[in-house]
């Protein structure tokens, strides 16, 4: 029962934040009305981002964010269409109307807040360094001169580029 209540609270926050906040900030924004009129909510996501959104053994897109999106769509009375996107081009996909929403591991930044309507955060996470347990790497400074893999267009990529001296490390 607690889980159901928590999901209901998250749904209320998401629906009101994404749509009501957007309508109050951008006078005349008809996004919600357009989605309801077409009857489909096109969700842009990275389909290789477990547990938030990924493909299961039947190649169906599933995950925590997908479950939340389904409940939001049910509340709005529209069908959910999950649209895998090139994560490096996510803002362009949204700006050109290819998708209605980016929902999955999207980091809130000041720059993004200036150009799009963002909901309240529903997950609190951070950038971390993942290495073998036997590695001598313990801090970001230990990565200097090493090859660092990041997802293109991610906040992890931004973080490493914002760290002086690491531009040449990104692969």
What are these regions (language model features)?
Residues 89-92, 106-114, 158-164:
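A ligand-binding cleft/hinge motif common to bilobed small-molecule-binding domains
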Residues 39-45, 141-157:
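Short loop->beta-strand "edge-of-pocket" segments that line small-molecule binding or catalytic clefts
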Residues 28-31, 36-105:
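Extracytoplasmic small-molecule ligand-binding "clamshell" domains
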Residues 32, 131-148:
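Flexible hinge/capping segments at coil-to-helix
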Residues 1-38:
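Short, low-complexity disordered leader/linker segments with a strong preference
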Residues 79-86, 150, 168-171:
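Short beta-strand-to-loop elements that line the ligand-binding cleft
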Residues 110-121, 125, 165-169:
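Ligand-binding "clamshell"
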Residues 43-46, 118-139:
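Hydrophobic/proline-rich hinge and linker segments of small-molecule sensing/allosteric domains
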């Amino acid at each position: 029962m607690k889980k159901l209540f928590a999901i209901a609270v998250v749904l209320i926050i998401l629906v009101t934040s994404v749509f009501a906040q957007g309508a109050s900030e951008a006078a005349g924004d008809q996004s919600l009305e357009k989605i309801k009129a077409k009857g489909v909510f096109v969700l842009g996501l990275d389909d290789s981002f477990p547990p938030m959104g990924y493909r299961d053994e039947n190649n169906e897109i599933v995950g925590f964010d997908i479950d939340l999106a389904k409940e939001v769509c049910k509340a709005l009375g529209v069908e959910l269409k999950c649209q895998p996107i090139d994560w490096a081009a996510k803002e362009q996909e949204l700006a050109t109307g290819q998708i209605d929403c980016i929902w999955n591991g999207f980091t809130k930044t000041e720059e993004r807040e200036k150009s799009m309507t963002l909901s309240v955060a529903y997950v609190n996470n951070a950038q971390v360094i993942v290495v073998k347990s036997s590695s001598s790497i313990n801090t970001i400074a230990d990565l200097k001169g090493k090859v660092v893999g990041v997802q293109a267009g991610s906040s992890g990529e931004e973080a490493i580029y914002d760290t002086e001296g690491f531009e040449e490390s990104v692969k």
